[in-house]
Design a protein with these regions (language model features):
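Metallocofactor- and cofactor-centric catalytic cores in central/energy metabolism, strongly enriched
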Residues: 1-116, 124-143, 149, 154
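Short, glycine-/Ser/Thr-/acidic-enriched flexible segments
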Residues: 21-23, 161-162, 200
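Catalytic or ion-translocation cores adjacent to nucleophile or general acid/base/metal-coordination motifs
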Residues: 82-104, 166-204
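Catalytic alpha/beta core domains of metabolic enzymes, predominantly
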Residues: 117-141, 145-149, 155-157, 161-192
């Protein structure tokens, strides 16, 4: 919980990126949401951002986080409640990226003839449909860029690609187009290094 505060207070920071999700995390969050419809997001995001929220607003730092898990809107609601307590709600422009949750559409997709086959075994999803806890498409950087372009200073997503959280500000700030492959490749490498935290400082 100290890392965001140290980053925000320790120097000139334009963007703070927080990555919370892994494949197994989505199933855990889905179970939480089934027990309580207001849950299903990374609640430790709210704790991590609490001490730095006034500083983020004061310094103009933008935040991008996939802390929305399987319930980005509830995560946004919790963040707005925190902003109320901190007295900064009027200074926040919050963007919420949705569209990754395909669980409600699985039966529709299979009925349209999509086998959604297991990549290793080739078996169709229908064989294990009753055991599926979550089904998410990976969202790229484009909707995050759209949120930034509309003035959002905090963007919460559901299941985005790990690199999208870094790629979005790079594309937004430097105007990289969708076919500038060398620049996009560099952004993907930067994103992978950053989202794997300790690798930024030589760890593994």
């Amino acid at each position: 919980l100290e890392a965001p505060r140290r980053q925000v207070e320790g120097g000139q920071v334009d963007y703070l990126m927080l990555d919370y999700l892994a494949e197994v995390t989505m199933s855990i969050l889905q179970k939480q949401k089934e027990r309580d419809p207001k849950m299903g997001y990374a609640r430790d995001f709210i704790g991590a951002i609490e001490s730095v929220l006034p500083g983020i607003v004061e310094r103009g730092v933008k935040v991008i986080a996939n802390a929305g898990g399987v319930n980005p809107r509830s995560c946004a609601d919790a963040l707005l409640e925190l902003a109320d307590r901190k007295g900064v709600r009027g200074k926040l422009a919050l963007g919420v990226v949705t569209g990754d949750d395909l669980l409600p559409r699985l039966d529709e997709l299979m009925a349209q003839g999509h086998a959604l086959a297991n990549m290793d075994t080739g078996e169709p999803l229908a064989l294990v449909r009753d055991r599926v806890l979550s089904a998410n498409a990976y969202i790229g950087s484009t909707p995050i860029i759209e949120a930034l372009g509309k003035g959002a200073n905090i963007v919460i997503t559901g299941r985005s690609t790990d690199t999208a959280l870094t790629m979005a500000p790079l594309r937004y700030e430097f105007g990289w187009g969708p076919t500038e492959w060398d620049k996009l490749a560099a952004g993907i490498i930067a994103g992978h290094i950053i989202e794997c935290g300790a690798q930024c400082s030589g760890g593994n």
